[in-house]
Design a protein with these regions (language model features):
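Active-site-proximal specificity loops/subdomain of glycosyltransferases
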Residues: 1-13
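Conserved donor-nucleotide/metal-binding helix-loop-beta segment in metal-dependent transferases, i.e.
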Residues: 27-64
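Short, P/G- and charge-enriched loop/turn segments at secondary-structure junctions
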Residues: 66-72
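Short beta-strand-to-loop acidic/aromatic patch adjacent to the donor-nucleotide binding site
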Residues: 16-28
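C-terminal catalytic/acceptor-binding lobe
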Residues: 141-192
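Short glycine/proline-enriched coil/turn segments at helix->beta-strand junctions
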Residues: 13-18, 36-39
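Catalytic core and acceptor-binding pocket of nucleotide-sugar-dependent glycosyltransferases
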Residues: 72-162
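Short His-Asn-centered micro-motif
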Residues: 21-23, 43-45, 84-85
Length: 192
């Protein structure tokens, strides 16, 4: 049920400051200027959609974890990119997420349980510990290009590319063109 558990275990072993980045997420520019100040940050907040982020009554397979000790109104973070600048908070978050997974060995809804452990708990832990948490962007900026070319997140487009080789080829060509434009010396090494 916990397909991304490896990321959380790895994060638990890496001291802050550190970044956790999904393989379908591209940072085209340095983000160090965006990370000055927060204890933790993620690419954007998520709306609380009950089908993905249900209330605590949905976690019937979780035993011994204090679900009621968290604020369920806090918007989850999308952790395709997550930053941890405060080591004490990083440890608290990873310990909490790993404890939740261990308390849910018979999780019956892989998506709900995993995004709770990885994304919703990040926001809940930050709220509970009064950690300074920041969203680096928002969905309209990511989809509309208003984030100044910092990021590409492939999301569900992966499936469309699997089903349509022309989409895949076009995406690869656009990435190659971007690499040539933004990193001419490095792209010459890669292309030849």
């Amino acid at each position: 049920a916990f397909w991304a558990a490896g990321k959380l275990y790895a994060l638990s072993a890496v001291p802050s400051p550190c970044v956790m980045l999904d393989t379908d997420f591209i940072c085209w520019k340095s983000i160090s200027n965006l990370l000055d100040g927060p204890d933790t940050a993620a690419i954007h907040r998520e709306d609380i959609m009950p089908s993905i982020y249900p209330d605590q009554t949905a976690f019937t397979k979780t035993e011994g974890f204090p679900l009621d000790s968290f604020d369920w109104t806090v918007q989850p973070f999308n952790t395709a990119l997550a930053y941890f600048g405060n080591d004490e908070f990083r440890r608290y978050y990873t310990d909490t997420a790993i404890r939740f997974m261990r308390c849910s060995p018979d999780a019956d809804d892989a998506l709900t349980y995993m995004v709770f452990a990885e994304q919703r708990l990040l926001a809940m832990c930050a709220e509970k510990k009064y950690a300074h948490a920041a969203a680096l962007s928002d969905l309209p900026a990511l989809f509309g290009g208003a984030q100044n070319g910092y990021f590409t997140h492939i999301w569900g487009f992966k499936q469309q590319m699997r089903e349509n080789p022309k989409l895949y080829e076009d995406f690869c060509r656009r990435c190659a063109a971007r690499l040539q434009k933004d990193f001419p010396e490095e792209s010459n090494c890669l292309l030849y």
